[in-house]
Amino acid sequence: MNYQEQDPEVWAAISKEQARQQHNIELIASENIVSKGVRAAQGSVLTNKYSEGYPGHRFYGGNEYIDQVETLAIERAKKLFGAEYANVQPHSGSQANAAAYMALIQPGDRVMGMSLDAGGHLTHGSSVNFSGKLYDFQGYGLDPETAELNYDAILAQAQDFQPKLIVAGASAYSRLIDFKKFREIADQVGALLMVDMAHIAGLVAAGLHPNPVPYADVVTTTTHKTLRGPRGGMILAKEKYGKKINSAVFPGNQGGPLDHVIAGKAIALGEDLQPEFKVYAQHIIDNAKAMAKVFNDSDLVRVISGGTDNHLMTIDVTKSGLNGRQVQDLLDTVYITVNKEAIPNETLGAFKTSGIRLGTPAITTRGFDEADATKVAELILQALQAPTDQANLDDVKQQAMALTAKHPIDVD
């Protein structure tokens, strides 16, 4: 009996998900498609091993080869970003952030981070998240005119609030972030600087976005998204913070690391070091800009900040007569996957929202070019122009399926 026959219910769901990924245009900005090597590593025998501790200092025996894999991941991460120190054990970006906070500050300390409706992440101080419960966070927003970061306003806020830590980075901000300015702001108020580059890490690695490593005390990231690796987290830092971060990850936040995932991280980081990754990253940005141009030329939607410098954009869909959740559900019926997203000064709440977020990493991995990306944006607008016309929606779905058929995912 093979494994599919052993548990047909689970494998039926996996098979359906594989089909969904094959025929859907994936525009969720945090998703991507990993290589066969990354997938194979995660399904390898490394999942059988327990390895609490760090290379050369484990609490279990038999970790000679686990040490080799983790050391490769560490060294590749340091080389890719020019970092003095790397920890590749965090299970997720959220756990990387939790460990960074634990290493740098104490519960109750003041912290500034981007507010959720401005494009920040839950772990940047949301009241429903551990970060907002354990630490005294104050959110900073965007310039009301440009919907971009206003560094003078952030400085004034920091001078008034006097945080011990400033967090830069976002999960839905489409413009370049000036980490040098954030460093200057932190220095002026005597704060530490942490950067969460989870979304833009691949663009940073490719030299297409400013690198926060020279400026930040600590940098956290996920290893998926634009890095195109397995689901997981990673921390980069100045060497002087290494011991504190190691202790904050293990035993502070986690027990045994996921060795099979760390192997996937090592493989992905090796891929990211290759010249062709830079070409891929540039295509991500080109595709995003092509989509933003289509939306900017339409009266039906509004691109927050007027465009994008990276892999994503937030679209205000209010003029369409639908909210973000309705647009997300509508597009799902025509095989285009997006997520609802709050816009600056959101009034509808997190479960409806006034916007959607779009990203191009996954479609770029599939081979979509600027013409394809332009077509995808046009299909979204076509669906929004007549959201109750089934013939119109059927036409959009057929065109979406034609695009994915032209660029299939290699899953064999």
Curated annotation (Swiss-Prot):
Pathway membership: One-carbon metabolism; tetrahydrofolate interconversion; Amino-acid biosynthesis; glycine biosynthesis; glycine from L-serine: step 1/1
Name of the protein in question: Serine hydroxymethyltransferase
EC code(s) of this entry: 2.1.2.1
Keyword entries, A-Z: Amino-acid biosynthesis, Cytoplasm, One-carbon metabolism, Pyridoxal phosphate, Transferase
Cofactor: pyridoxal 5'-phosphate
Subcellular location per the Swiss-Prot or TrEMBL entry: Cytoplasm
Record-stated family: Belongs to the SHMT family.
Main subcellular localisation: cytoplasm
Reactions listed under catalytic activity: (6R)-5,10-methylene-5,6,7,8-tetrahydrofolate + glycine + H2O = (6S)-5,6,7,8-tetrahydrofolate + L-serine
Recorded GO CC terms: cytosol
